[in-house]
Amino acid sequence: MTDSFQRNHAYKRNGEIFDVSLFPKGMHRVALGIEYNGSLFHGFQSQVSGIATVQKTLESALTFICNEPIALVCAGRTDTGVHATNQVVHFDTHARRQEKAWLRGANAKIDDGVSIRWAQVVSPLFHSRFSARARTYRYIIYNTRTPSALMKNLVTWDRRRFHLDDMIEGSRSLLGAHNFHAFSGADCQAKTSIWRMAAIIVNTLGAFIVI
């Protein structure tokens, strides 16, 4: 291994690893599958103002049980009000725990609105963002004349009549590869802005339209 390779690929905590030998001894990479109610947080990413975010809540709990500062990397950041059922995150730590201990310990310290569904010690080569092969999003429309008080923060309500066949037909133009640069933020770190939409499924379930 050349000196230039080591300099260019030196270990950065939680960063992308290209050679296992560069991962510090005694360090472990842990992946988590998390679920959260986005209506209780101002998005995923920590913010300078200190307002409640998913990342801040999780890092606080993990820092406590690991007894060292923990920083998370997620597969993809979400905005205020966006929920997740299986968001993947990872972190590096010196702490050694059984996988069930990560679940019980962290969930006992996490605030309401966030839950860790699974935990797994993974290879240092794994990266929650760059190892992701695909992402799945679900949009739910509650299509009735009046809104629901119980589901206000869980679904989108719209009283207008939707034509399912037209929605399916229109969605076909979104399939395939597209350049999403216009939707990228100024600090976007993605390696490319071209992504492929593999499938769009539109179904109804009673008064719900699920996309």
Description of each model-found segment:
Residues 3-211:
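Structured-RNA-binding interfaces characteristic of tRNA pseudouridine synthases
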